[in-house]
Amino acid sequence: MKALASRGTRNHLAGEAAENSVLRDYERRGYHLVRRRWRGRCGEIDLIARSGDEVVFVEVKQSRDFARAAESLGARQMKRLHAAAAEFLAEEPDGQLTPMRFDVALVDGTGRLEIVENAFGHG
């Protein structure tokens, strides 16, 4: 049981480190953090950033390699992300008309990043 707790703690810390790394990358590129780990009724969004008028919803995936990280984002999770984003946008002045996109940030076991901008639509 202790090994499971230890692995869970390791995974949690690795996920936090991945989010921190991705956030630094976005900030370096001029984005401003709006919310981190935003949670609505429909689910959680890892990072919400803004560049000008555009809102960027970022899902961070960390694994041994980029392929495994990418494969861990399934259709059900994408549907939850869409629903959570719609919930967040409902509070924006322009609502669903707010310019936005979904990015997926892949982080491999060595900490390298690969950002897939506009990874999937929002319809």
Curated annotation (Swiss-Prot):
PANTHER family: UPF0102 PROTEIN YRAN
InterPro entries assigned: Restrct_endonuc-II-like (IPR011335), tRNA_endonuc-like_dom_sf (IPR011856), UPF0102_YraN-like (IPR003509)
Protein name: UPF0102 protein SPO0400
Gene3D superfamilies for the chain: 3.40.1350.10
Domain of life from the UniProt record: Bacteria
NCBIfam families: PRK12497.1-3, PRK14676.1
Cysteines joined through disulfide linkages: none
SUPFAM superfamilies: Restriction endonuclease-like
GO MF assignments: nucleic acid binding
Family: Belongs to the UPF0102 family.
